[in-house]
Amino acid sequence: MPRSLKKGPFVDGHLLKKVDAQNEKNTKQVIKTWSRRSTIIPDFIGHTFAVHDGRKHVPVFVTEAMVGHKLGEFAPTRTFKGHIKDDRKAKRR
């Protein structure tokens, strides 16, 4: 169920402060964050966020198409190595 429109999108306060400070200074430094739950808003466009995926920070450059999505959607947490191939020689013995 989506979030109520009267509440607006959720963005962590510390993240919003960092983006506003960079917008005032006209700088574009990487913003390191653990807040995967924050919704991307139009103020974030053009900024790069280092989103934590559980072991490292993944750089995410925000574009217009990402507005409305969560930061965590662009930093996958699981790595699929593939299924192990069946080794028939080892089974025959």
UniProtKB/Swiss-Prot annotation:
Presence of keyword Ribonucleoprotein: yes
Q: Which gene encodes it?
A: rpsS
TM spans, by residue? none
This one is known as Small ribosomal subunit protein uS19
What GO CC terms are in its UniProt record?
Answer: cytoplasm; small ribosomal subunit
Family (UniProt): Belongs to the universal ribosomal protein uS19 family.
Could you tell me what this protein does? Protein S19 forms a complex with S13 that binds strongly to the 16S ribosomal RNA.
* Pfam families registered for this protein in UniProt: Ribosomal_S19 (PF00203)
Which organism was this protein described from? Mycolicibacterium paratuberculosis (strain ATCC BAA-968 / K-10) (Mycobacterium paratuberculosis)
